[in-house]
Amino acid sequence: MAGRVFEAWKGSNKFLFGGRLIFGPDAWSIPFTFLLIITPVCFFSVFVATHLRRELLPNNAGHVFLVAGVLFTVFVLILLFLTSARDPGIVPRNSHPPEEELCYDTTVSSDGRQTPTVQIPRTKEVMVYGVSVRVKYCDTCMLYRPPRCSHCSICNNCVERFDHHCPWRNYRYFFMFVSSATILCIYIFSMSALYIKVLMDNHQGTVWRAMRESPWAVMLMIYCFISLWFVGGLTGFHLYLISTNQTTYENFRYRSDNRINVYNRGCSNNFFETFCSKVKPSRNDFRAFIKEEPPRNITLATTWERPEEADEENREERRQKVEDDLDIDEDVMKLQQRLNDEEGSDTAHHKIDIDQMRIGSNERAPTIRSEARHGNWGARSNAQEEDVIAGSSVRESRSYAAAEEGR
């Protein structure tokens, strides 16, 4: 029985629940991220929100702070799970290079012979919004990458609209996650500061005295302040990228190459495209069974010959074979003329000539002029050579017998 696609996947992804969930090779960091989110919220619920509920008991506002913190934390964790377990837009790789893109290139070898080879252009031009954009060929996936697609060296896949590799792999949900995490940090920081303010008002003390009474609130404020620099800065940077319709990779590349961003269609349209456009279905069915490909008629090789060049080489070979046959016929005629001239000579001398001819014929047979130039004749050339040697031997035998009778 054929296996499923995720079982033979060539990328570095990790699959769970029979290919229903797909993670990156660094999926181990997801539980660690969960702990970084859940741990401060637990301390906030036990040491801040509970006491804040008691201090604000007459107004029943403390329950709202506790429930809001827990629900918002659950929302952030759901976003983290959605962004880390979904297909980020992996482009299916090909099993062989695209044949329609093959082109011939002539290379000159060390002996001076030109050999046509098959090559695939490294880049090609495509039109995007009326502007020509160059796309590259991926040797690993054996395809031309679509516009805004790059090959991720960590997960070993070509990913559409590749931004950067991190545990949160889908861009829309990734932005919602970091922005929600930013709001959660601000919320916990604000509630911890509010709790210290309530302690100051109720006990008529100073800030330092209130901080000593609730050290957990101070620790949460420090933790959220440090985290806010990371997730808050990341949220602000990606707000800029969304407003200009760029990815992190494109931002650095355009800045270094001074290239024009052809995808920028205005701030409002860019935000609409990011958050309101329909999410395309995945190109991969990881749970599907592997289908065996039919045998291909064309076999790709490192060296190819053009059809017209192959025909020209065959014609040259046939022409050379005809020339070899003509050379053999010429040698046969000369040998017959020599035998006819020697038949009218003296008997004694004729006998000596016949003996020499035997030796000469044995030496000449394998050293015909055409053999020196071409090591292999055809079946016709070999047959004619055997006829010449056999005919010369018969004539020599008859001449020798006639000479013996005359003596």
Curated annotation (Swiss-Prot):
Active-site residues per Swiss-Prot or TrEMBL entry: 166 (s-palmitoyl cysteine intermediate)
EC supergroup of this enzyme: transferase
Location in or out of the cell: Cell membrane
Membrane topology designation: Multi-pass membrane protein
Pfam family, one: DHHC
Domain DHHC: 136-179
Tissue expression remark: Mainly expressed in seeds.
GO molecular function: protein-cysteine S-palmitoyltransferase activity
One GO cellular component term noted in the UniProt record for this chain: plasma membrane
Disordered as annotated region, ranges: 300-407
Enzyme Commission number, as recorded: 2.3.1.225
TM spans (from-to): 28-48, 62-82, 174-194, 217-237
Reaction equation(s) it catalyzes: L-cysteinyl-[protein] + hexadecanoyl-CoA = S-hexadecanoyl-L-cysteinyl-[protein] + CoA
Biased composition (Basic and acidic residues): 346-356
Record key words, sorted: Acyltransferase, Cell membrane, Lipoprotein, Membrane, Palmitate, Transferase, Transmembrane, Transmembrane helix
Family named by the database record: Belongs to the DHHC palmitoyltransferase family.
Domain notes: The DHHC domain is required for palmitoyltransferase activity.
Purpose of the protein: Palmitoyl acyltransferase.
Protein name listed in UniProt: Probable protein S-acyltransferase 9
Gene: PAT09
